[in-house]
Amino acid sequence: GLGDVYKRQVLESAITDTLETNYMPYAMSVIVSRAIPEIDGFKPSHRKLLYTMYKMGLLTGGRTKSANIVGQTMRLNPHGDQAIYETMVRLAKGNESLLHPFVDSKGNFGKVYSRDMAYAASRYTEAKLAPICAELFRDLDCDAVDFVDNYDNSMKEPSLLPTTFPNVLVSANQGIAVGMASQICGFNLGEVCDTTIALLKNPDHDVASTLLAPDFPTGGQIICDPAELRELYRTGRGGVKVRSRWRYDKQANLIEIYEIPYSTSIEAILDKVAELIKAGKISEISDMRDETDLSGLKLAIDLKR
């Protein structure tokens, strides 16, 4: 009967064998194909977008509509237009999420420090490659990197970009894969290049003496002991405390915050302060508002007289 059919189809397998044959290949495909940045500092989605823009002549030419770039990128990246456009937004100058943006943008690309400041649709914005991209593609035609087939074998794309500087350390990047996650802070471009040159000249060079601490696109102050920082980078575990930068306007009796930690947003700060005022933990503040405008970020805190 039917019960006998089911009994015959039950296969016994050791969990260790199943993990090795099923889970590990799946985890590796997510790590390699989607989530974790490669040694050039890019995830596949970033690399495909930038290479498409390079092939469109956007390194030397004028800007084109973002929607045009997104459409062309689909030949390399079989994702929806919104996913590709979000990748472009993060790489854009207007969004301010990178120390050295790769996309020279025109129009509203939102802000990394604002949850509510939405970016405009791709049909309204324009973009081209930023000048720094010349260093990403230098010697691309000189057999510097391997080329592989795209998803439908209709064209070739580079497996890596031949960056002339260690971009993986310059561009902040985070990725969540299966069984693995990476969170890489960005560093000052000049310090990274100086450290790289020093290491090439002397393999025993003390990296921490020239690469002092991470740099964040939104600014702020790092509150960390140098010895702790050294240990953090030796082990790869731990975190860095960052606080806002502010100034006091004596005449108006208010505090102006003009730089905030990279991992937070204006709205999250306003919500948290309001929560602390309601809980009675802060009593010196009479009002707090977002005065961010075209000149940059600004949070105003009115103090009680």
List each language-model region with its residue ranges.
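Charged, surface-exposed alpha-helical interface/stalk elements
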Residues: 207-227, 235-305
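Glycine-rich phosphate-binding loop
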Residues: 1
